């Protein structure tokens, strides 16, 4: 087969053959196979050229994808599939990128976890889930997590939550709120509980009473539209108790309120 035309098309070259076949190749392919107009290729040479062209093009795509941020092996492979790189070529591209240290799942996991320690708020369980979603294997994640101390981060997150809610919730509800938030963020129950030891939940009686008054007014406005009498009183009690207020304090307020 003879090359009848070579034309540059942006980042690729269009090659046309005398059997009416055409294909796009990279500049690396042109150089490697010394392609030029009127050059004759046998079947083996043509197949080698096609394979290298896919490999070269796929690698260039991957490097473009990696230029924005670190990616996992799986993320790069998925990106190549999306751009219709042949499936049997993808492992070769991934291997080259690994050998040249463009991708490294262990380093990616380490960087992701360290960045979270500096400016994130996620515990180990959530971090592991996010890394697994990127296609990183547990054996690349677990050793790094086990060597990372999350106690200071848990304290920082709990302090932020404490500052946000301390003027809105009584001590018990505030503790429950912080604990649940830390669990949702992926911290262990023990770590969440331990982080509470660094917070001051000793609100004064007047502060708690003021919070109770505000919550009672709020619940009354909502519940009095549907209920009255004894049912309203019971509904108010249940709502306030769920918010973490003391049973005796609630009953005292309700006696004077209704």
From Swiss-Prot:
Q: Which residues form a coiled coil?
A: none
Keyword hit for Lipid biosynthesis: no
Return the Pfam families for the record. RecX_HTH1 (PF21982), RecX_HTH2 (PF02631), RecX_HTH3 (PF21981)
| UniProtKB keywords | Cytoplasm
> Where in the cell is the protein located?
Cytoplasm
Gene Ontology cellular-component terms listed? cytoplasm
| One example of a Gene Ontology biological process annotation | regulation of DNA repair
Looking at the keywords, is Cytoplasm present?
yes
- UniProt record similarity statement: Belongs to the RecX family.
What does the UniProt record say this protein does?
Modulates RecA activity.
Q: What is this protein called?
A: Regulatory protein RecX
Q: Which organism is it from?
A: Streptococcus pyogenes serotype M18 (strain MGAS8232)
């Amino acid at each position: 087969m003879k090359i009848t035309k070579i034309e540059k098309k942006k980042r690729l070259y269009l090659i046309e053959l005398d059997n009416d076949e055409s294909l796009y190749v990279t500049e690396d392919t042109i150089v490697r196979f010394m392609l030029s107009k009127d050059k004759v290729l046998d079947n083996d040479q043509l197949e080698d050229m096609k394979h290298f062209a896919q490999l070269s093009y796929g690698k260039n795509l991957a490097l473009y994808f990696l230029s924005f941020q670190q990616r996992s092996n799986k993320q790069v492979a998925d990106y190549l599939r999306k751009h219709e790189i042949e499936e049997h070529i993808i492992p070769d591209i991934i291997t080259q990128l690994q050998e040249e240290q463009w991708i490294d799942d262990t380093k990616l996991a380490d960087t992701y976890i360290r960045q979270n320690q500096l400016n994130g708020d996620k515990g180990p369980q959530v971090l592991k889930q996010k890394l697994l979603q990127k296609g990183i294997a547990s054996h690349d994640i677990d050793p790094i997590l086990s060597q990372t101390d999350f106690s200071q981060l848990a304290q920082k997150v709990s302090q932020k939550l404490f500052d946000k809610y301390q003027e809105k919730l009584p001590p018990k509800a505030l503790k429950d709120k912080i604990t649940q938030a830390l669990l949702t963020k992926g911290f262990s129950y023990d770590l969440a509980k331990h982080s509470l030891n660094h917070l001051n939940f000793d609100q004064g009686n007047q502060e708690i009473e003021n919070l109770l008054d505000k919550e009672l007014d709020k619940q009354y406005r909502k519940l009095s539209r549907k209920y009255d009498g004894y049912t309203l009183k019971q509904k108010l009690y249940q709502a306030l108790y769920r918010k973490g207020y003391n049973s005796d304090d609630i009953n005292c307020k309700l006696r004077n309120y209704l």
